[in-house]
A protein has these predicted regions:
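N-terminal secretory signal peptides that target proteins for export/translocation
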Residues: 1-3
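Sequence-pattern detector for short linear motifs
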Residues: 5-7, 35
């Protein structure tokens, strides 16, 4: 079963959870039917979730460049606390493996990137970059300025390049904040240029569950920043992570929404740019309140992460792709574990 159907159930759990008390006696409350029938978790895995353990699974994807992973955990806390923690992304996403993180102002300012250091390997790669052949994801205009404005033979070349990269990132953040998805760039690190806006739109096209279950949320994501949606928070932030073989500098747009008529929460974290590996990514998280309020506050946190990458090539491509998929699944597990700890105050 393709991930689009799976997430349809995931998002639908929010609506169903609000009516859980009206179910027939003996019926399983959300999200258990989804976890059992759609994700096909075993009784042992469902029991592990009830014990507060993180359970993850790799999902099928529509084509080779797209990878998907799902995870779930039961959290002893309130959805309101989750929303409060998620609003503070500098703390919420600050975990081992993300040594640098920052939030953009409105509008973005170059000072917002004060805590960012550019990896030495990226600076070395940029010295040799040319369109269609670069070890860093970069756009035509940015690459042109790095070639023309930085004297790579000078002693201060790395400092000049770092300052220019931050200037380019700030301009990119401003363009995205003003123009949304259509303002996302075109990378020219490979022989075939990649339009990041089209890569993200492909993820949305493969995600009709947003249209079916939360059309207002989907429309808001598509139209951002032109539309408005009640009970919604938007955060534009950046990170440098060290999870992979290379440090990755990324820019994200997080949207946190409390759907009307539910007690749950829906969040979408969109990758606006990544210096390596990722052409687009969309993470959808749903907090589904537990039906037994008498037992105390609690909710199930469901996480679906989907990304489009440049697939590995060559004789070891299958092995490398397996490692990439495993790494993404581990990332989902780590996110759920850290989120649970943040909400529970551990």
């Amino acid at each position: 079963m393709r991930s689009r159907s799976m997430v349809g159930w995931l998002v639908g759990c929010l609506t169903l959870s609000s009516a859980a008390s009206a179910q027939s006696p003996g019926a399983e409350p959300p999200p258990r039917p989804f976890l059992r029938k759609v994700i096909q978790l075993t009784d042992a895995q469902l029991a592990a979730i009830e014990r507060g353990e993180v359970v993850t699974k790799q999902l099928p994807s529509p084509d080779k460049p797209e990878i998907a992973a799902f995870g779930a955990v039961k959290v002893n806390g309130t959805v309101a606390t989750l929303r409060e923690r998620m609003r503070d992304f500098q703390t919420f996403r600050k975990v081992p493996g993300i040594p640098e993180i920052g939030r953009f102002s409105t509008p973005p300012r170059i000072e917002d990137l004060q805590g960012l250091t550019i990896p030495d390997d990226d600076l070395d790669a940029l010295r040799k970059c040319k369109p269609g052949e670069c070890d860093v994801k970069v756009g035509t205009a940015g690459l042109g300025r790095l070639v023309k404005e930085v004297d790579w033979k000078a002693a201060d070349a790395n400092a000049k390049a770092t300052a220019l990269i931050k200037e380019l990132m700030t301009a990119y953040a401003k363009a995205y904040a003003a123009g949304g998805t259509d303002a996302m760039g075109v990378t020219v690190d490979k022989s075939k240029p990649k339009a990041l806006s089209e890569e993200f739109k492909t993820l949305l096209r493969n995600s009709p569950y947003l249209v079916e279950y939360v059309p207002a949320f989907n429309q808001y994501l598509e139209a951002y920043p032109k539309g408005s949606l009640p009970d919604t928070d938007d955060v534009l932030f950046w990170t440098k992570d060290t999870f992979g073989l290379k440090p990755v500098v990324s820019m994200y747009h997080a949207t946190i929404h409390m759907p009307e008529g539910t007690r749950g929460l829906l969040a979408a974290i969109k990758t606006v740019y990544a210096s390596h590996y990722f052409n687009a990514a969309l993470e959808v998280m749903a907090a589904v309140p537990t039906p037994d309020e008498a037992a105390g506050p609690g909710f199930y946190l469901l996480d679906l992460y989907r990304t489009r990458i440049d697939p590995p090539t060559g004789m070891l491509s299958g092995v490398l792709m397996g490692k990439v998929k495993g790494g993404i699944e581990q990332g989902v597990a780590m996110n759920l574990k850290n989120t649970k700890a943040r909400v529970e105050g551990k």
